[in-house]
Amino acid sequence: MKVSLVLLIAVFGLAMVAAEETLESKLQMALKSLLQENEELNLEGRDTKGGCERATNNCNGHGDCVQGRWGQYYCKCTLPYRVGGSESSCYMPKDKEEDVEIETKDTVARCERDTKNCDGHGTCQLSTFGRRTGQYICFCDAGYRKPNSYGGCSPSSARELEYLSYVARDVEMEMLARDSVYQCNRDTNSCDGFGKCEKSTFGRTTGQYICNCDDGYRNNAYGGCSPRTEREIEYLSMIARDQELEMQARDSLPQCNRDTNYCDGFGQCVKSTFGRTTGQYICSCNDGYENNLYGGCSPKDNEDEEVDTDRKMEILRSLANLLEE
C-alpha cells in the first residue's frame, strides 16, 4: 500500500512539473504575441503590399513591405535602419546618421562637387557594401585616407601608413595559410628549410598552418621563408615599439602621473590620439629623452642611436613571442 502511495505521489509530481513547463511555455508565447501586437499597433499599417510601398516610398529603399500577423503590411527595415516617421518608413537612427551623411552623396556629380573631386586623390564610386550601399563615396588613392570633414581624401600620416602596412601584412598572412601541416610543407618546400609549419594561434590565421620562420627570415610570396632585409627589420622594430607603448599606457591622467612619477620630470602625460594607445595616457618625453620600461622618461644613450643588428633581432624575437600569446 505504501509503495502504491509513493508511486501515485511521484506520478502526480511529474504531471505537475510537466503542467508547469507547459504553462510557462504558453505564457512565453502569449508574451511574445502581445509584444508583436503592440509593435504593430504602434506602426501605421497598409491593407496591401502595393499600398505600403507607395506610402513608404518602398521603405525608402532600406527594407521591404511584409505582412504582419493581423494582415496589414509594414516596413521590415534592413539594419541599421529602423521604422520611424509619420509614414512608418525606414530611417537611419539619429546616432548613426551624422557620420554616414558626411561621407555619402546621392549622385556622382554631388560627390565630386562636395569633395572637390576627392581632393584630387581618389574617385567617386558607387558603394556596394554596408550602410553606404547605393550611394557615392570617395575611394581614396594609396597613401590617402577617408573621410575628412567633408568626405574627401586627406594624406595619411607616416604612422598611419605604417599601421596600414601592418594590417595589410595581416591580410597577406591569411592568404598564405594552409588547412593542414601536410599542405603547408608541400606548398612551401618545408618552409624552404628556414622554418617549420605550425598551427597558428593568433589573428586571422588561427587554426590554420603557416610557416613560422627562423630569426632573420620572413614569409615570402608563396608562404615559405626568405632572408629579411635590413629595412624589414627596422619596420618590425617599430611595430614592436608600438606593442611596448601599449603596455605602458594608462587609463587616466592621474594614473599616468602616479605610475611614472610625472614622467620622471622629463616629459608630460598626454592623451594618445593614434594607434593601439588611442584614448589612453602615455608619457610624451622631452627632446633627448625616451620612454623607459615603466613608461616614464629616461635620457637617451647616444650609443643607442644606431641600434646594431643583434638588438634588432632581439626586438624581432620579442614581437614573435607577443604574437604567439
Swiss-Prot record:
This is Exogastrula-inducing polypeptide. Residues 48-91, 107-154, 180-226, 252-298 form the EGF-like domain. The EGIP peptides are factors effective to extrude the archenteron toward outside of embryos. May have a role in the induction of gastrulation. It comes from the Eukaryota. One of its GO terms (biological process) is gastrulation. PROSITE patterns: EGF_2 (PS01186), EGF_3 (PS50026). Residues 20-45, 160-177, 232-249, 313-325 form a propeptide. SMART domains: EGF. Residues 1-19 form the signal peptide. Keywords: Cleavage on pair of basic residues, Developmental protein, Disulfide bond, EGF-like domain, Extracellular matrix, Gastrulation, Repeat, Secreted, Signal. It is found in: Secreted, Extracellular space, Extracellular matrix. One of its GO terms (cellular component) is extracellular region. Disulfide bonds join C52-C65, C59-C75, C77-C90, C111-C124, C118-C138, C140-C153, C184-C197, C191-C211, C213-C225, C256-C269, C263-C283, C285-C297. Its main location: secreted. InterPro entries: EGF-like_dom (IPR000742).
